Swiss-Prot record:
This is NADH-quinone oxidoreductase subunit E. It comes from the Bacteria. Belongs to the complex I 24 kDa subunit family. The gene is nuoE. It comes from Buchnera aphidicola subsp. Acyrthosiphon pisum (strain APS) (Acyrthosiphon pisum symbiotic bacterium). Its cofactor is [2Fe-2S] cluster. Signal peptide: none annotated. Transmembrane segments: none annotated. Keywords: 2Fe-2S, Iron, Iron-sulfur, Metal-binding, NAD, Quinone, Translocase. SUPFAM superfamilies: Thioredoxin-like.
């Protein structure tokens, strides 16, 4: 990660929320995941500039914040669509047919894994497990979980998300 020379500012709301977390932790590095979630909730993703701003508030090295951001798949390091589709690509969902669901999603959305639709409506991401192994294949759209899917069910499901 290159050092960013452009001055970037978090909002007062973001700063206050991050500062509020300090009372719960002795080691401020432990706050980095919460700080990343605070920034992402407001902005939709976490830029390099935000990484440096978080590190400054927490008085830690930016590489520590970057390490946390890149480790957690729920932290987005580039802009994403309004609706995040996560499909489970675990062994169990493989056995229950996730590949057919993945293909149906890609065909309907006209994007590949990791891409966002041209209208910024959807981003398609694989995840290792959604914890719904007895009901696979499973996807999540934002915070909503859908199980026992068929390729034919994908169009009507996606149409309900604007």
């Amino acid at each position: 990660m290159q050092e960013i020379s452009i001055k970037f500012k978090l909002t007062n709301e973001e700063i206050n929320a991050i500062e509020n977390q300090k009372k719960y932790y002795e080691d401020f590095r432990a706050i980095s995941i919460e700080a990343l979630k605070i920034v992402q909730k407001k902005r939709g993703w976490v830029s390099d500039q935000a990484i440096y701003a978080i590190a400054e508030i927490l008085h830690i090295n930016p590489s520590d914040v970057e390490g946390v951001a890149t480790f957690y798949s729920q932290i987005f390091r580039k802009p994403v669509g309004r609706n995040i589709i996560r499909y489970c690509d675990s062994v169990v969902c493989f056995l229950t047919g996730y590949k057919r669901i993945q293909i149906a999603l890609e065909n309907y959305l006209k994007i590949k894994i990791g891409e966002t639709t041209k209208d910024d409506r959807f981003t398609l991401l694989p995840v290792c497990c959604l914890g719904n192994c007895d009901k696979g294949p499973t996807i999540m759209i934002n915070e909503d979980t859908y199980s026992v899917l068929t390729p034919e069910s994908i169009p009507s499901l996606l149409e309900s998300y604007k």
